[in-house]
Structures are given as C-alpha cells and as structure tokens.
A protein has these predicted regions:
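Juxtamembrane intracellular "pre-TM" segments in multi-pass secondary transporters
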Residues: 2-17, 191-241, 433
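Helix-loop boundary and gating motifs at the non-cytosolic
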Residues: 13-63, 234-273
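Helix-loop junctions at membrane interfaces in 12-TM secondary transporters
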Residues: 20, 101-114, 314-327
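Helix-to-loop junctions at the C-terminal end of transmembrane segments
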Residues: 68-82, 164-166, 283-296, 381-382
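Conserved MFS/SLC helix-loop-helix module at the cytosolic interface between two early adjacent transmembrane helices
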Residues: 68-105
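Structural signature of the two symmetry-related core transmembrane helices
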Residues: 85-99, 299-314
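Cytoplasmic helix-loop-helix junction between adjacent transmembrane helices
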Residues: 114-149
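Symmetry-related core transmembrane helices of the 12-TM Major Facilitator Superfamily/SLC fold
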Residues: 172-189, 389-407
Length: 455
C-alpha cells in the first residue's frame, strides 16, 4: 500500500504530493474500518445464536439509517460547507458506539448497539467519497488510483481479521473502534481546497473527468433538475441498475458468513473469500476510465448485473473453488457499478450538491437495495435454506436486469424523437466502437463550447 501511496502522490509540487498521500490514506482508513465490521457481522450474529430472520432484521438497520439518517448528514455537510468537520465527528461517534456491542448478546442489546452504531457509520462512505473525489480534482490526482488504496486496505484487513477472529471473535468491535479512530486521524490530515472551484468540476479526478464526460447528462435540455440535484432524468436508470446489482450483492455479502458457517467452515474462510473479492477489484480500477469511455456506463452497468447472476450461482454451489470463483467476480459486479455510478453522480450533480448527490446513490445502493436483500434474504433463508436462497436471488437479479434494460431503451427512444442525439455513453446498451467514439467527440465539442459561453 505504501508503494501505491507514492504512486498517487507523484505529481509536481510538494503540496500536491502530500495531498495525494492524504487522500489515499483517508480512503484506506475508511475501507479498513468497513472491512473489520461488515463481512464478519453475520458470522458473529450466528455465533451468538441469532436466526437467519433475526440476522436479516439486524442487518437491515444499516440500510434504514442510510435511507432516513444519512441524507441529513449529507445535507448538513453541504449546507455548512464543513464536510471534513462533519466526517471527523461521525468517525469519532462511530468509534465510541462500536463498543456498545459489549453491553450484551441478547437480541435487544445487539439491536440497540446496531441502531446506534449505524446512525453514524452509515454516513461515512458518501461524505468520504465527496471529500476524496473533490480533493482528487483540486490536486489533479486520479481517483481510481486513490480508490485502489481502499481496495488494498480492505483486502488486508479482512484477511488478517478473519484469522484473528477465529481465536477471539469478541475482539471484532475493539478493532472497529480502533480503525474508526484511525479514520478520524486520516480525516484531520486531509488537505483543504486550494481554491474555489465549481462543484461539478471538482467532482472528478483529472483522468475520470476526461472520460466520464461521455456519461450523459445533457440529453434533455431545459429539463428541471431531478430531485433538485441532478441535471438529467437518466439518473433514474443509473440508480435502477445500482439497485438491481446491489440487491444480489447485498444478499451475498450479508449472508456469506452465515452460509460459510452453515456449510461447516470457519471465519477464516470468510476472511479469505472477502480478501479475494477485494483484490479482484484492482485490475478494473487500473482500466476503469478507459472501459467507461470504450463501452459506456450503461453497457457496463448492464453487464455487471448479468455477472452478478453468475456470481450468485457460483457461490450457491457451496464448494470452495466455486465460491472463490464467485468472489473473483467482485471486480465486474461491484467495482464497475461503483465507479460508473460515483463518477456519473459527481459529474451530473449541480454545483453545491456533491455530498447530496453521492448521498442519493448510497441511499439507493446501500439503503433501499440492502433492505430488500436483508429482509427478503433472511425470510427466504429460513424458509428454503441458504443454498436455494442464492439461486432464487440470482433469478430475481436476472429479471430485474431485463426490466431496467427494456425501460432504458424505451426512454432513449422517446428522448431521441424530441431531443438531439444523446452522447456516446448513453448508447452503451445498443452499440459502441467507432460510431460511439465519433458521437462522443461531437458531443464533447458541443459541451465545451456551451461551458465556455457560460463562463
């Protein structure tokens, strides 16, 4: 991870180098904290005697907080302009509330601890992303490279923690507390903005900004902002793909620990599987902006949902080799969705709405989709067993993907009859290649001219 930090910071000027390293370690700190908490939670709940339905309810507390509480933190962050201070306070509160899990192992005690913890922890990701993405733009650091630090940190923690928790499972929440304090330190070390910038321009890193301009947000001229945050109604389909994909990914992630224990394996295997999935993200991060430019955001999102079906089927087989193969698909089931959606949201959000834009994405992905995954997954798991539940979830994801693809094509057809042709990436589901690149160049030229006139 240190070598990656140096690579991120290799820019002219000491301030830029220091800023790149600070952004890198802030991302590492968050994903290390998430890696110590999320993957092992269902295993811990199983070890203290919770049923699948009870686990589903407990795991739903975090999505509920994402839906109802996290947007309030994002709005406070944007309204005050003090994103770093808000994120620091949330990190400190997360560290303190993690220790509430030691109050008892009854269902009520665990439920209370979970509710209090997620009130703060659920807001860390969108606020951290907003700060890091804006910092990457301000200091000309590639966001994909910074995000690789988070992947490495997550993989390192889940592997080490998985082995450690085999011997001392009760230590999980002490580790979460310590890593939340590390997150606090990394936030305090984040650089300030070097100058006032347009919030939309500050949303992307230099490389991501060049390629994500192919993401459509100008297909509907003179249309009121969607949710008062986004420039185009196309955001509905971006969020729909994120929902469908996360519905499968959320089920798999939430109940993988229980499934592994049910199959007779230990927490060590949970750590190994989580590390494998995290490390598989690295190749995608190296080429993510090129993939978006080549195939388009919608193509990648549709492809990711199809691969999510394959991942669920492989894990559902219950064999270690197939489970490892399924986890290797993390790169094309999570990271492609995360990168496409995060960059799209960052570019299409109106000025001053960056935190709220990322908040909407997290609300749909980590909130609504996770609630469906956890509640339905817990009920199906108790009724049919975890193996069959994986297969049933794969079928639901496949149907959802088909519905969103058809709806998007219908919407595009309507737009094409009333507006100028959409930019290249919006054609992702029906074509790519030279024609797409030509359309992208034309739309990019038009967009640059419009922005120049606006200035």
């Amino acid at each position: 991870m240190l070598s990656q930090a140096r690579a991120v910071g290799e820019r002219p000027g000491g301030g830029r180098s220091k800023a790149g390293a600070s952004l890198f370690f802030a991302n590492v700190a968050y994903w290390m904290c998430a890696g110590a908490y999320t993957p092992f939670l269902s295993s811990y709940f199983t070890s203290i005697g919770m049923t699948a339905a009870q686990i589903g309810v407990l795991l739903t507390m975090s999505p509920l907080a994402v839906v109802f509480i996290q947007p309030l933190w994002a709005r406070l962050s944007d309204a005050t302009g003090k994103r770093r201070l808000v994120l620091a306070l949330l990190s400190l509160a997360s560290a303190a509330s993690a220790l509430l899990y030691y109050l008892g192992t009854s269902y009520t005690a665990v439920l209370v601890a979970t509710i209090v913890f997620v009130l703060f922890f659920s807001a860390l990701l969108p606020l951290c992303d907003a700060l890091v993405i804006q910092g990457c733009s301000d200091y000309e650091v590639e966001f994909a490279h910074v995000r690789m630090g988070g992947t490495c940190g997550y993989a390192f923690v889940v592997f080490i923690v998985g082995m450690f928790l085999e011997r001392l499972p009760q230590a999980q929440f002490v580790l979460v507390c310590a890593l939340s304090l590390l997150m606090l330190l990394s936030v305090l070390l984040l650089p300030g903005s070097p100058g006032r910038k347009d919030a939309c321009a500050a949303a992307l890193s230099s490389a991501a900004a060049q390629d994500s301009s192919s993401l459509v947000h100008d297909a509907q001229p003179n249309v009121k902002p969607t949710f008062g945050i986004f420039r185009s109604q196309e955001i509905f389909f971006i969020l729909a793909f994120a929902f469908v994909s996360q519905m499968g990914l959320g089920f798999s992630g939430s109940f993988l620990g229980r499934y592994v224990v049910e199959l007779g394996y230990s927490q060590g295997l949970v750590g190994v599987l989580s590390a494998v999935s995290a490390l598989s993200e690295l190749p995608i991060l190296l080429f993510s902006h090129a993939l978006v430019a080549r195939f388009g955001a919608m193509s990648l999102l549709g492809f990711s949902c199809i691969m999510m079906v394959a991942r669920l089927l492989l894990i559902g087989m219950g064999l270690v080799p197939t489970m490892v193969a399924g986890q290797l698909l993390q790169s094309v089931t999570y990271m492609t969705v995360y990168y496409c959606c995060t960059c799209y949201v960052a570019e299409s959000a109106l000025p001053g709405k960056l935190s709220q834009g990322q908040s909407v994405f997290v609300l749909v992905q980590s909130g609504l989709a996770m609630m469906v995954a956890n509640l339905a997954g817990g009920a199906i798991g108790d009724a049919f067993g975890m193996r069959l539940s994986y297969f049933l979830t794969a079928g639901l994801v496949l149907m959802g993907t088909f519905v969103v693809m058809v709806a998007y094509q219908v919407w595009r057809s309507g737009i094409s009859r009333t507006c100028a042709p959409a930019s290249a990436s919006s054609r992702g589901l029906i074509g790519s290649g030279q024609a797409v690149r030509q359309d992208h160049q034309a739309s990019e030229s038009t967009e640059k001219g419009g922005r120049h006139g606006a200035r």
